[in-house]
A protein has these predicted regions:
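Short alpha-helix plus adjacent loop in nuclease-associated cores
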Residues: 124-151
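Hydrophobic, well-ordered secondary-structure scaffolds
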Residues: 1-2, 12-21, 166-170, 191-196
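Acidic, Mg2+-coordinating catalytic module of metal-dependent nucleases/exonucleases
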Residues: 98-104, 109-110, 147-217
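Substrate-recognition/cap helix-loop segment adjacent to the acidic, metal-dependent catalytic center
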Residues: 105-126
Length: 217
């Protein structure tokens, strides 16, 4: 019997700066998908890293997490160790064999997620988008028309901008909450698949030292 490959699209919200080698995650969300369907989602809050008294959290974010903690579908873990165990079990229960994120060099290298996915095949969705859509004339025109450029003059490829392109909705604003972001990143990945083009696996976007293996899946 043929079994479709299951992918997990993962997003984390963390404390810490861009230069930190490890960032404590207070929110982890993931979506298990095949090429045809969404199988499952998980929404984890890590209490030991959720410092609601900190100025780091704006008023809107504090209200969001207060409400989230009351949601019965949310898994509340008191420590990162507990979150690792819960998340690893979810990956196993869903037979996940490949993990994906938009900017894997952060989510997969600087959070507790790295211990849950050790040895798994992975895709950087930002890299996949660059390989399949980001270099097309249509995407370049889209960025030109809307002013979506980096400081160095390159087309922006944040999850928010990529999702705006694949949905043709320039008003979309990314939530920057883990599960919601994983859902939009799953749709970006599906748009990459729809091109039927090869893209890179097991390498982070911008990690040019890694061997770039292009494959169709």
């Amino acid at each position: 019997m043929f079994t479709e490959k299951t992918f997990a699209v993962i997003d984390t919200e963390t404390k810490g700066g861009v230069k930190d080698t490890y960032c404590p995650a207070y929110h982890c969300g993931a979506t298990a998908i095949t090429r045809r369907e969404t199988k499952s989602t998980i929404n984890i809050v890590v209490i030991e890293n959720l410092d609601m008294a900190s100025a780091f959290y704006g008023k809107q974010k504090k209200e969001y997490y207060r409400d989230l903690l009351k949601d019965p579908s949310v898994i509340i873990c008191f420590t990162e160790e507990e979150a690792k165990a819960v998340f690893s079990k979810w990956l196993a229960d869903n037979n996940v064999t490949c993990v994906c994120a938009h900017n894997t060099s952060f989510d997969f290298c600087r959070t507790f997620v790295r211990e849950c996915i050790e040895g798994m095949e992975f895709f950087d969705i930002m890299f996949a988008f660059f390989d399949t859509i980001g270099q097309t004339k249509r995407y370049n025109q889209f960025c030109a028309e809307n002013g979506y450029y980096t400081a160095s003059g390159n087309c922006r490829m944040t999850a928010e901008i990529c999702y705006r392109f694949v949905t043709n909705d320039t008003s979309f604003i990314e939530e920057h909450t883990a599960l919601a972001d994983s859902l939009i990143e799953a749709e970006i990945l599906r748009a990459c698949w729809a091109t039927h083009k090869k893209f890179t696996r097991n390498a982070h976007k911008g990690d040019y030292r890694a061997k770039q293996i292009r494959c169709k899946i």
